[in-house]
Design a protein with these regions (language model features):
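Extended, hydrophobic/aromatic-rich amphipathic alpha-helical segments that build helical scaffolds
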Residues: 1-25, 39-53
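A generic helix-loop boundary/linker signal
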Residues: 15, 32-33
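Long, intrinsically disordered, low-complexity segments
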Residues: 34-102
């Protein structure tokens, strides 16, 4: 997350760069260091590093790629970026309105 924040324009701390942070991790994992880092590279690296951590959907939304076709998924409804509000919660708080599309 820190490398992504720096890559997106946040101020680095302790003279670190996004590339150096990712390469430190890759070195620990016995992977070859990268010479360049883009947001697409960062998304791919997060997919490898956080495999099975259930962060992929959120990452795809944050990187603006959730609606893209990939693998067996052909497209996605933009309304599905957010989840529905459970009926039990809406009963407890009548002021809540269901998210659009549900």
């Amino acid at each position: 997350m820190k490398a992504e924040a720096i890559l997106r324009g946040a101020a680095p701390t302790y003279n670190t760069t996004a590339l150096s942070l990712v390469n430190d991790l890759r070195t620990t994992r016995k992977a070859a260091p990268m010479t360049n880092l883009t947001l697409d590279d960062m998304l791919k690296e997060r997919a490898r590093e956080l495999n099975w951590e259930t962060t992929r959907r959120t990452d795809l939304i944050r990187f603006g790629k959730y609606e893209d076709a990939w693998g067996y998924k052909t497209d996605a409804d933009k309304n599905k970026r957010i989840f529905p509000i459970p009926a039990a919660e809406r009963i407890l708080n009548p002021g809540l309105q269901q998210n659009f599309g549900y």
